[in-house]
């Protein structure tokens, strides 16, 4: 709403005239009781647009006005750390378009399932945060909490075992294909907070969801904080994920499924409600191909958790894990459902290898829900530090992430 604006030059002129008028009066003036109304001075908290403001109490000499983000981009967009951004609905980055977010940008989302950021196949997201100035995507609520808004969804063209043209669980975007090296951009030093808005009990956002994202994508130094569902989840694809943090997820902390063929190093996981890591092949067909195959190293999982440091489910896959540190788990290192025959078969055939497992008391108590008999590929250690500092917060996570 446009309000009456008094230019600063006019304010100064008026003040000078009042001063001059006062100086010219004498004791004999008959108008000595004249009262001159004071000139209103614009402030940044008076609830109206005035002075040099470009909005109500914002812009000009005041703090920057919020810029609303919503809709499907039609051209490349680069944000500016000097601005305030409000995510008021779905922001879609379509094929051929790039969204670039430099260091220090914060995006605050309105509450509900309609507020999320989605990168479609062929679109790109470049997040150029730094350890000192991360990019933050968070809730705009005065009392933020898990599940406030959607989250970040990225869809690529890399292989999955659910088909070459699947539809994402949220945002209804196509993903999957045959391009192993598909590139969805560069994402580094990103913190995503209070995500996980719920559609139904079976459909809700994660902090970051990567659907068929390819190995040409850089995904590192990313944190999910207080997600209502999973923190970070890989749905197939070939992208690698390094230096990942999940704190306070409402479900699994880091999840991968649907034929993810990638690697991850330096993951710090704590305060998750269910599994530290959930690794599965395919919920409808445990033998689907390509089989989930991952190589992980330098991992810390700090409990308590209700479904183990690793929940090996729905056919599991071929997992190689080195330097796994676990704490506060009550020996819940590996969980397998008693009815998951494909996962059980793979486990006893040696498809899970864990070297330098620190924090477990003995091999016989590693698994819950299943009598695990093949321990040849699991070696215990007393010296591993997992993500770098054992159960403590790692040094590489300082500054840009939060505990």
Where are these regions (language model features)?
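Glycine-rich loop(s) and the adjacent beta-strand/alpha-helix scaffold that form part
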Residues: 133-134
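Bacterial Sec-dependent N-terminal signal peptides
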Residues: 4, 16-47, 55, 59, ...
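Disulfide-bonded cysteine-rich modules in secreted/extracellular proteins
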Residues: 41-50, 67-75
């Amino acid at each position: 709403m446009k309000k009456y604006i008094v230019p600063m030059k006019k304010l100064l002129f008026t003040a000078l005239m009042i001063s001059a008028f006062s100086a010219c009066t004498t004791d004999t003036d008959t108008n000595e009781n004249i009262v001159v109304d004071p000139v209103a001075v614009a402030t940044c908290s008076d609830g109206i647009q005035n002075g040099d403001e470009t909005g109500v109490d914002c812009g000009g000499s005041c703090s920057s006005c919020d810029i609303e983000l919503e809709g499907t981009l039609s051209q490349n967009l680069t944000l500016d750390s000097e601005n305030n951004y409000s995510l008021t609905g779905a922001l879609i980055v379509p094929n051929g378009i790039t969204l670039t977010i430099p260091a220090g940008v914060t995006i605050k989302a309105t509450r509900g399932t309609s507020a999320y950021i989605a990168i479609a196949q062929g679109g790109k997201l470049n997040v150029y945060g730094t350890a000192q100035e991360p990019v933050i995507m968070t809730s705009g609520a005065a009392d933020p909490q898990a599940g406030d808004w959607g989250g970040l969804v990225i869809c690529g063209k890399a292989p999955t075992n659910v088909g070459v043209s699947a539809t994402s669980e949220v945002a209804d975007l196509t993903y999957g294909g045959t391009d192993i090296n598909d590139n969805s951009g560069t994402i580094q030093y990103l913190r995503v907070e209070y995500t996980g808005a719920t559609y139904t009990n079976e459909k809700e956002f994660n902090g970051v969801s990567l659907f068929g994202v390819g190995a040409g994508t850089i995904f590192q130094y990313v944190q999910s904080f207080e997600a209502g569902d999973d923190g970070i989840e890989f749905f197939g694809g070939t992208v690698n994920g390094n230096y990942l943090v999940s704190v306070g997820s409402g479900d699994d902390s880091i999840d991968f499924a649907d034929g993810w063929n990638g690697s991850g190093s330096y993951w710090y996981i704590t305060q998750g409600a269910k599994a530290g890591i959930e690794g599965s092949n395919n919920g409808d067909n445990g033998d689907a191909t390509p089989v989930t195959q991952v190589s992980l190293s330098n991992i810390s999982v700090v409990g308590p958790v209700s479904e183990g440091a690793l929940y090996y489910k729905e056919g599991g896959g071929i997992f190689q894990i080195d330097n796994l540190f676990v704490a506060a788990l009550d020996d819940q290192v590996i969980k397998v459902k008693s009815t998951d025959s494909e996962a059980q078969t793979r486990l006893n055939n040696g498809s899970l290898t864990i070297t330098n497992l620190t924090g477990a008391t003995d091999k016989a108590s590693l698994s819950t829900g299943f009598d695990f008999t093949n321990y040849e590929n699991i070696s215990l250690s007393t010296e591993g530090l997992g993500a770098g500092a054992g159960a403590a917060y790692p040094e590489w996570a300082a500054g840009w992430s939060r505990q």
